[in-house]
Amino acid sequence: MTETSFPGWHGTTIIGVKKNGKVVVAGDGQVSLGQTVIKGTARKVRRLTPGGHDVVAGFAGSTADAFTLLERLEAKLEATPGQLQRAAVELAKDWRTDKYLQKLEAMLIVTDGSLLLVITGAGDVLEPEHDIAAIGSGGNFALAAARGLMEADFDAETIARKAMQIAADICVYTNGNLTVEAIDA
């Protein structure tokens, strides 16, 4: 997702990498309006602890919309403790069918350490191939870089950081100011 319906607002880059029993979610800190960087230190990766179960979530798209979705996800996780996939599917169903939520423009990458999922407003809950998920304006660059690095002797955090740096070097809507959260399987 590279833009919202608000003219000129551009997204971010978020990547999730799962390797050797660890999942890392990393996101850049840039918020842009047209050709102007509004903020370079936004935090778009969060750790949630509903019911004492750790979940890491990263978002791309409208910040207000993403926070609304994160609150809903947290409520779903509290209702179904330790069941990330079920909570994600319930959120996606609500997002797809609720008239208010349908207007929200964001995407999420979420993990509990065992599952790595992408949740979209189209009602998709996707577990990515190759244990890598990437969203946002630089998502394809980060995904390609991470796939190339997976066979090397790097851990999940190193792969995520290197992939994000490559995306930041290519995508003008992505910077190198990263927020990184790791979670064990």
UniProtKB/Swiss-Prot annotation:
It is found in: Cytoplasm. Protease subunit of a proteasome-like degradation complex believed to be a general protein degrading machinery. GO terms for biological process: proteolysis involved in protein catabolic process. One of its GO terms (molecular function) is threonine-type endopeptidase activity. Belongs to the peptidase T1B family. HslV subfamily. Keywords: Allosteric enzyme, Cytoplasm, Hydrolase, Metal-binding, Protease, Sodium, Threonine protease. It catalyses: ATP-dependent cleavage of peptide bonds with broad specificity. It holds the Pfam family Proteasome. The keyword Metal-binding applies. It comes from the Bacteria. Its EC number is 3.4.25.2. InterPro entries: ATP-dep_Prtase_HsIV_su (IPR022281), Ntn_hydrolases_N (IPR029055), Proteasome_sua/b (IPR001353), Proteasome_suB-type (IPR023333). This is ATP-dependent protease subunit HslV. Na(+) binds at residues 168, 171, 174. The active site is at residue 12. It is an enzyme of class 3 (hydrolase). GO terms for cellular component: HslUV protease complex; proteasome core complex. Allosterically activated by HslU binding. A double ring-shaped homohexamer of HslV is capped on each side by a ring-shaped HslU homohexamer. The assembly of the HslU/HslV complex is dependent on binding of ATP.
